């Protein structure tokens, strides 16, 4: 784990109410596995809020990395005001990232909302290792979708919106269709209702492969000290920050 002040490179809207921030830090960008996260202190030195915020690595490029965040409270409002050259205190990388198959295969990535973030990093790594990747993303409206240029060009980008403004109408887990049979491995990140829906769909279709999910829980500390991110699994209580955020879908849902 590295504790370092990262320098803001850019901080721009990805979609309404959600920003993509690029930061520079050789230490924080080194040896990152897709699915890992870092803690970002979203205030000036010693100011409120006290607890850091957890953000997944969305992209990593050399000594730079990007995070995707929604502006929903004091901390992220402060973060949204940072400009190029500002310093932001962070520590990471933390958690257990995704495991990619040794042999190239067909990978289906399922995401919703800001849950898209670690899946972009996963797609970049997977494409580089020769995997075929389909990214199926769900959003409320077309305006809430991550623009296609953020994905590697080799990725097939499929989107679903709840209002039907782009792609099929409904929830992303209800439109997996042919991709369920095509996929040799499934990864997902998003809210818990999406995970539950994904588990139900796969069970109903007799697909008992074991998708890896990246859970989104409030993680005040990031290393297992506060027990604020407990996840109840069939193997007992686990901590999202320390034991996750990668879990087996059917161990939790």
Q: What is each residue range found by the language model?
A:
Residues 2-84:
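Ferredoxin-reductase
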Residues 45-55, 95-102, 241:
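Short, Lys/Arg- and Gly-enriched loop/turn segments at beta-strand edges
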Residues 74-218:
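FNR/FR-type flavoprotein reductase catalytic core
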Residues 172, 237, 249-253:
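A charged, well-structured terminal subsegment
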Residues 201, 223-224, 245-253:
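Nucleotide-activated chemistry modules centered on ATP-dependent adenylation/adenylyltransferase
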Residues 216-245:
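Local cysteine-cluster metal-coordination motifs and their immediate loop/turn environment
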């Amino acid at each position: 784990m590295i504790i370092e002040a990262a320098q803001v490179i850019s901080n721009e809207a990805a979609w309404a109410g959600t920003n993509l921030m690029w930061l520079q830090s050789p230490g924080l960008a080194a040896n990152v596995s897709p699915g890992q996260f870092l803690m970002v202190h979203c205030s000036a030195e010693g100011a409120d809020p006290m607890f850091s915020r957890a953000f997944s690595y969305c992209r990593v490029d050399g000594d730079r990395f990007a995070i995707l965040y929604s502006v929903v409270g004091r901390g992220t409002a402060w973060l949204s005001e940072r400009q190029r050259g500002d310093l932001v205190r962070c520590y990471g990388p933390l958690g257990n990232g995704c495991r990619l198959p040794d042999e190239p295969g067909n990978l289906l990535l399922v995401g919703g909302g800001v849950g898209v973030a670690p899946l972009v990093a996963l797609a970049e790594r997977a494409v580089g290792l020769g995997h075929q990747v389909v990214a199926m993303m769900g959003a409320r409206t077309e305006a809430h979708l991550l623009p296609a240029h953020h994905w590697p060009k080799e990725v097939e980008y499929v989107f679903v919106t709840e209002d039907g403004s782009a792609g099929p109408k409904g929830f992303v887990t209800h439109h997996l269709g042919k991709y369920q049979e095509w996929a040799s491995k499934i990864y997902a990140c998003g809210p818990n209702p999406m995970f539950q829906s994904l588990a139900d769909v796969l069970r109903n279709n007799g697909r008992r492969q074991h998708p890896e999910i990246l859970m989104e829980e409030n993680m005040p500390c990031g290393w297992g000290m506060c027990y604020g991110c407990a996840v109840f699994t069939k193997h007992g209580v686990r901590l999202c920050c320390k034991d996750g955020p990668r879990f087996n879908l059917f161990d939790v849902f």
